[in-house]
Swiss-Prot record:
Parts forming coiled coils: 17-75
HAMAP family: GreA_GreB (MF_00105)
A UniProt-annotated Pfam family: GreA_GreB_N
Name recorded for this polypeptide: Transcription elongation factor GreA
Keyword Ion transport: no
Length: 158
């Protein structure tokens, strides 16, 4: 059953989902053709091509339904339109770690999250710990390697 809870994301995340949906919908008729071709080869009980195509069709249909659900619940947020002194979805934050080394993250949705580029999900342990914090607040996050401590040094809405 689909959820009716709003799903915050940036315009970039919405674009990524829309492009993936278009790609999957374009693949859909190709899979149907592959199923028909495999079906023409006879006995379906031992037809690996048929079963692989049917499995791929199921994956595509599930992915399409998931993306359509997420897009229907999307609440697109433009960080440049936000302001305030607390960390919220879309904010870009500069933190000082245990070594006083600055690290910078933007709080984003699950679709856009990519730690390598400094984008963390609001649902991640660090994202959850940061939401609502202000400059000079300390943040403690438990990660597999132990507890990490950060100091919020800057909040930007860019």
């Amino acid at each position: 059953m689909a959820s009716i809870e709003k799903l915050p994301m940036l315009a970039e995340g919405q674009k990524m989902l829309t492009e993936e949906l278009a790609r999957l919908k374009a693949e859909r008729p190709l899979i149907i053709d592959a199923i028909e071709e495999a079906r023409a080869h006879g006995d379906l009980s031992e037809n690996a091509e048929y079963h692989a195509a049917k499995e791929r069709q199921g994956q595509i249909e599930a992915s399409i339904a998931d993306i359509e659900d997420r897009l229907s619940r999307a609440q697109v947020i433009d960080p440049s339109m936000l302001s305030g002194d607390k960390i919220v979805f879309g904010a870009t934050v500069t933190l000082l770690d245990d070594d006083e080394k600055p690290v910078r993250y933007q709080i984003v949705g699950q679709t856009e999250a990519d730690a390598k580029t400094g984008k963390i999900s609001y649902n991640s342990p660090l994202g959850r710990a940061l939401i609502g914090k202000k400059v000079d607040d300390e943040v403690e996050v438990t990660v597999p390697s132990g507890d990490r401590f950060y100091l919020v040094s800057k909040i930007e809405f860019i």
